Amino acid sequence: MKQIYYVIQTLLRGRGSNIIKVLSLGLALTMSILLFVRVVFEQSYDTCYRDPDRIYQLFSIFTINGEQGEPGELNLPPVAGAVLENFPQEVEAAVSVCKYMAFGPLYNGSVRFKDYAVMADSLFFQTLGIEVLRGDPLHELQQKDVVFLSDRLAQKMFGDEDPVGKVINYDKQLQLTVKGIYAALPENSTMNPEAVISIVSAWSRDWAEYSWEGGDSFFQYIRFRPGVKVDVEKFNARLETVIHNYLPQDGKDNSSYTSIVKPLRDVYRSGDMVKRMNAITLILGLAILFIAAMNYVLISISSLSYRAKAVGVHKCNGASGGTVFSMFLLETGIVILLSLILMVLLLLNFREMIEETMEVRLTSLFVFGRIWVPLVVVLGLFIVGGVLPGRMFSRIPVSQVFRHYTEGKKGWKRPLLFIQFLGVAFICGLMCVIMAQYHYVLNKNTGYDARSIATSDIYFDSDSERDAARQFFCGLPYVEDVESASYPPCIGMSGMRIMDESGQSLFSSRYCVETEN
């Protein structure tokens, strides 16, 4: 207890420098922990599914005039079924998922829900290993106008009412019956819909093409059987042969198509942008934490001149070097604890801004499985900030009580100051580069002027309905002009192959259907 009393008195006596320590470490811990947790969050993508190592994603490769394109996530509709049919010994399940046919909102009565939905076949939950809480998707998703909701969306829509059997509306077009509930998926998953609509609902209305000649708009996944050792190269070679047997062989086209598989666990993590951002985030977090630790060490060692006599007094009263060392560790622990309290206050008060900047909820970042990240950061800071100065203080001799301490040698300060200034210069330079890139992207010429333009997704069954809506918007006094297009440039466009007169593929091009203006 005496040690705690002496430590508290020491902290109160040097409260000016200790306030600086708490502020410095609080800000550094906030930033570094957020950055490190974000990296771990990114690296844990697609681990929420059951046995994720058995799930593989299909990718399409188009070749035109001998030029092979990059693998793309969108596949021809029948590919997943062909894989399941031709590899019964290896593949347990396969699924086709379409996103673009489920872009519209869901309605419960007049209440609109713009939650992420997809259309998928009956093997969706079995293939991805998503827990189904109620309902039989193998049977129900073979019927049209059927939907399964996540427990999160079901709670949002119906509260404590039983959602099964209720009828909701998709985009004012389809009446969907809720047939089941499944466990909601976390944010760090590439396929995490809040609603799964039976894809039969689209096929029965001819909303999309289902053939080997087009309609490559489907995300597709396969699940290998337990115990199957997947040699990706050999499997892809066999898959290429299977796909070739299904493709039309009319001899007129100079293009070809094949599919490959990649482990779902690696698809997101292996992206160039993800790897680059993780590297930058990790370096920035380490730099911030290192600078804060060096700042703490520098402030602590700087107090050596006026704390040396106090340490000597403790030793005259029987304190050993270990006791002095433990007192300094306790002091460091209290400072770090106060810094953690400051960090929590910052996270709570700036939560909305942090979540908007990081594009993920704090509750998703700080789950139980990632608590080790802040613990490791705090432990590392405690070792660097407590052990190094603590050993210096514990070695002060008893004779220091009878001497006037003068700080004759200052060479030890210069390396620390150099490292600190170097780190600050690095972070400032990195932030300047990031701000310059942000300014460039924000002001880059996109080819169109987005000022005073409002966009919305509206689907019409006929040209007459579209024209009527256009006349309505044109009649509004605050509207200058109205235009409609199948794929606005700010959203993206679909693609199609351009043929010559003989039917040979020349190239693939983006296209957009628009009205006369």
Question: At which residue positions do the language-model features occur?
Answer:
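Membrane-proximal extracellular/periplasmic loop immediately following the first transmembrane helix
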Residues: L35-F103, E213-R223, E233-R238, K262-D266, ...
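Intracellular coupling helices
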Residues: I4-L12, G16, M294-V335, R395-T406
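Mid-to-C-terminal secondary-structure elements
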Residues: D121-R134, V147-M273, C474-D481, A485-N517
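Short, strongly hydrophobic transmembrane alpha-helices
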Residues: Y6, T10-Q43, D53, K413-Q437, ...
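Membrane-helix entry/capping segments
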Residues: K2-I4, I8-I19, Y49, R238-A287, ...
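Short juxtamembrane loops and helix-capping segments at transmembrane helix boundaries
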Residues: Q43-P52, E194-V196, A202-R205, V261, ...
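Small-residue-rich transmembrane alpha-helices
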Residues: L34, H244-N245, T332-R395, A436
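Alpha-helical transmembrane segments of integral membrane proteins
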Residues: I20-M31, N278-L298, E331-M343, V373-V378, ...
